């Protein structure tokens, strides 16, 4: 009886580990397929930098600090630029 229980638990543990590893591999392969080329990422970075610095300059003319929430998607406004958090 103990041997059967140990065998069942071992099999269940192996199944869980195998499933987790398979999900990780699938997620990695999807990330690699969906990723943007470096040139497109650079264009997005430049656009965010421009938007943030322009909005910060407008805010500063009114003697206000740069709005931190102006940059989105893991970016924040710092020194009149959008920087990756």
From Swiss-Prot:
Highest taxon, organism lineage: Eukaryota
Signal peptide: 1-22
Swiss-Prot/TrEMBL keywords: Disulfide bond, Neurotoxin, Postsynaptic neurotoxin, Secreted, Signal, Toxin
Database matches in InterPro entries: Hwtx-2-like
Compartment list: Secreted
Pro-sequence residue ranges: 23-48
One Pfam family of this chain: Toxin_20
GO cellular component: extracellular region; host cell postsynaptic membrane
Cysteines joined through disulfide linkages: 52-66, 56-77, 71-82
Flavoprotein is among the record's keywords: no
MF-aspect GO terms: toxin activity
Tissue specificity statement from the Swiss-Prot or TrEMBL entry: Expressed by the venom gland.
Family membership noted in the UniProt record: Belongs to the neurotoxin 12 (Hwtx-2) family. 02 (Hwtx-2) subfamily.
Role this protein plays: Postsynaptic neurotoxin.
UniProt-recorded name of the protein: U4-theraphotoxin-Hhn1c
């Amino acid at each position: 009886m103990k041997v059967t229980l140990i065998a069942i638990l071992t099999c269940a543990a192996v199944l869980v580990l195998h499933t987790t590893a398979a999900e990780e591999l699938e997620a990695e392969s999807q990330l690699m397929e969906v990723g943007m080329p470096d040139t497109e990422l650079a264009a997005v970075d430049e656009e965010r930098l421009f938007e943030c610095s322009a909005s910060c300059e407008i805010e500063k003319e009114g003697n206000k600090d740069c709005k931190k929430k102006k940059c989105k998607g893991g970016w924040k406004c710092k020194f009149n630029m959008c920087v990756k958090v």
